[in-house]
Structures are given as structure tokens and as C-alpha cells.
Amino acid sequence: MSQQDKKLTGVFGHPVSDRENSMTAGPRGPLLMQDIYFLEQMSQFDREVIPERRMHAKGSGAFGTFTVTKDITKYTNAKIFSEIGKQTEMFARFSTVAGERGAADAERDIRGFALKFYTEEGNWDLVGNNTPVFFFRDPKLFVSLNRAVKRDPRTNMRDAQNNWDFWTGLPEALHQVTILMSDRGIPKDLRHMHGFGSHTYSMYNDSGERVWVKFHFRTQQGIENLTDEEAAEIIATDRDSSQRDLFEAIEKGDYPKWTMYIQVMTEEQAKNHKDNPFDLTKVWYHDEYPLIEVGEFELNRNPDNYFMDVEQAAFAPTNIIPGLDFSPDKMLQGRLFSYGDAQRYRLGVNHWQIPVNQPKGVGIENICPFSRDGQMRVVDNNQGGGTHYYPNNHGKFDSQPEYKKPPFPTDGYGYEYNQRQDDDNYFEQPGKLFRLQSEDAKERIFTNTANAMEGVTDDVKRRHIRHCYKADPEYGKGVAKALGIDINSIDLETENDETYENFEK
């Protein structure tokens, strides 16, 4: 039956006799509580909004196909990469970070870049951003980042003072802040930006040899960005500009593509690497660890229903497949818990049964989880009436030892180690990034920073100028000039191991 031919029913199939007139006592009288369709409709409506994501709330998504173009089987035995030309169905969700569901797409902000690959060995989620680094390297700061970039508890407004007080309280944040204040801080749309796995992951092959890897996704559409002025004009007329661009491009057959690359570092190279190779505030230089092409993905199908496929999409870095593994990256380790936990709160314990999250490459009929029950357990018959314990005499829930991973390298005793004693090289990489910019691009960094710091107190501005100066004197002087602050009035010699308590007041 076509959608047009369907007649109105309640959620349990009862025919609805009148959808416009409530049941009342007399033509003008009060409503009767026996108008079951009215009660059902309103109670359903009252509950139809689910909790929004704590970060990355405003998002757009599409389905597509990943195709292997180069052989990397010497690094990994993951079946998704097993042969050139192999294709895997996938889903991608892009997002802003700080804004709520109704936020404007063209804001200066990081963009989420989350990919879900439906492989024959289970779902692989790569939960990244459009930047290769992050503001900090210890997950204990996650909650504070959320509060600093979200709404102030007193005014209920976004507050630049909170943003910059937090960011400048962490000297290691300068690398990410520099990217955010650069031209790439406002992508023109979702199709014209790169993506990054950001974290360090690992791969292992049939011989159990492990290498550390970083994932890169380079847009085949080219990089295009917006100035602050261009973004303001777009926001004034279209708050959904990026979502509209992606949807309309796919709808008319202009399918966007990205090329997947990896950087590879051996375990021996990691031991001798200048910096901590698992530090999320730093990159691996391409001249030392060149990009290796892997494949490409194309987004070629829009969701039929936004709520079903985009709002209910659940990504978690714990969704990883044989041949791929984690690393000692503290931020990645923290996300291994927080993402799945957030999805269980937002969508329920059985969110894996929602169609967009199901392991399509395996087939829902072939999975055999030990979990049972819980709200909305509907898809797999709750494992039926079969054995629900282990060990048992029926061979159910037997392990698959052939998928055992190689030993994971660790080092040291459990302790709350001071990260600043381990590494205080905060400014080398943002300095190099700044020097890579053209003169015009540098000027835009200065101007964008001044625009973003409007209303911020002088002590926080001076703190940021000092960090910029340590990265490169020209950087610090340019930001100071844009902010109208005399560079000579700032103590530029504060020690590198400064902490929040030691900042000048």
C-alpha cells in the first residue's frame, strides 16, 4: 500500500474516526478522557524528543560506500582492507561541536567527522574531527571543555570569556586554537573539508606485528572556507547551510568523495620519537611519516528519515574490528568509556538494534551477544528461549580464539603522572603551523582571534598573546596588535611549565 492510500490509525492499529474534532460533552463542553486518540497523540508527542548529544549535537549524515584502492595487508589483516576493489557499506555523520541542535552550521567551530563501516567482522566506528589535534591530552578535562564552550550557568548565553579562560589555561591547546582561528576554522560546507581520526590507533597483521597508525581523509572536492564576514551573511539567511549543501548535492547525484590515508609508525620508531607519539595535541610530520593511500569513500544516499538514521546514529571507538586496535593515547582510552555510556543514556541499552547501528555486514541474525533483556529488546528475539549462561553443553557463546589480538605494549606503574613533567613542548608545532601560512592567512588569524576574543578580559588576552609569542614572535606581535595591546607590556619570559595557578593576574 502506498503512503498516499494509508488511513489513520493509532499506534496499536485502531482506526481513528475523527482526527480534527475531540470527543466532548456537548458541542462546546469539556473534553472526555475517553478520547483515546487525543490522549495517545499528546502523550507520544510529550516524549518524542530524546536527549541531545552533550557535544556534536547539530549533525548531518549520509550513507555511502568505501572502496579499497591500495594494498595495506602488510600492516593489517582486517578484512575490510583484504583486497583492492573491495567495497563496504558505510554511514557518515558530520557535526559542529559546541552548538545545540538548532545552532548555525557556519559558526567558527571544530567539525565532527564520524564514520561507521559495516564490515563482515562487525561495525567499525572511526570517531574523528576535521582537525588532526585537540585542545588537551588528558580526558579528565572533557567535562570542563563542555562547560567552557556551552552556555554560561548564570546568563544561559555562550560566553567568549569562558572559552578563552579555559583554552589559555592549557598551553597545549594553542595548536588546536591556531587551527580554529585560521581559515579552516569555518569550512564553507561539509564536502569541502578534510577529516582525521586524530587519535593514534594500531594495526596488526597475520604475524602479530603491530604498528601505530593515524587516519586521514582528504576531500576530493578541495578545501573551501568562509571568512567571518561571509559566515555572518550565511547565518543571517540560512542556519542549516552545510546540511542543505550536503543533502542537495547527494540528491542531485553530485556525490562527495574523500581519500583515506594512513600514517604508519613502528613500535621501535615510537620508542625513539621526539615527542609522545600518543599525544593528541601533536601531529606526526608528513616528511617523517608520509601519507599512505588506502582507499576512498563516496557518500551517495541521503537518509529517508533524519531522526531514524542521523539523530539515532551512535558512534563509539570501542566498535573496532580484528586487525585494528587501540593505543596508549589517554584521550582515546577515555573515549572508550564515555561514548558508549553516553549512547546508553541517550538511546537506551539496546541502541545497537536501531537500524543505522545494526551490524549489517555480519547480519543481525548471525550475532550472538551474551546480553539479554533491557528496554526495547526487539530485533533478535532476545536470543529466544535458548541457553543464556556459559559454560554450557550446547556450544553456545564459545569464544573465537583465532581473533585474539597480539600483546598490547604498556610501560610503568599505575600512578597519576604529571603530564607537564613528561612533556612541556607546547609551542613548537603551533609555531611551525603559523609559519606555513601565507602573509594574508596570518593576518586573518590575527583578525579572527581579535573577533573571537571580543569581550574577553585583558588578563586572558595577555595569556594568549604570551603563548602565541612563544610559538613564534611574529604570531604574538600580530595577535597583540589586533587586540590593541602593547606587546612590551606583557611578561613574555614566563616558564614553560606554567599552570593555571601560575598565570599572571
UniProtKB/Swiss-Prot annotation:
Residues 1-25 are annotated as: Disordered. It comes from Staphylococcus aureus (strain NCTC 8325 / PS 47). Induction: Induced by hypochlorous acid. Positively regulated by the ferric uptake regulator (fur), in a Fe(2+) dependent manner. Negatively regulated by PerR. It holds the Pfam family Catalase. InterPro entries: Catalase, Catalase_3, Catalase_AS, Catalase_clade1/3, Catalase_core, Catalase_haem_BS, Catalase_immune_responsive, Catalase_sf. Its cofactor is heme. The gene is katA. SUPFAM superfamilies: Heme-dependent catalase-like. The keyword Transport does not apply. Keywords: Heme, Hydrogen peroxide, Iron, Metal-binding, Oxidoreductase, Peroxidase. Decomposes hydrogen peroxide into water and oxygen; serves to protect cells from the toxic effects of hydrogen peroxide. Involved in resistance to paraquat when fur is absent and to tert-butyl hydroperoxide. Is important for survival under glucose starvation and desiccation conditions. Not required for virulence although is necessary for nasal colonization. Gene3D superfamilies: Catalase core domain. The active site is at H56, N129. Heme binds at Y339. This is Catalase. Its EC number is 1.11.1.6.
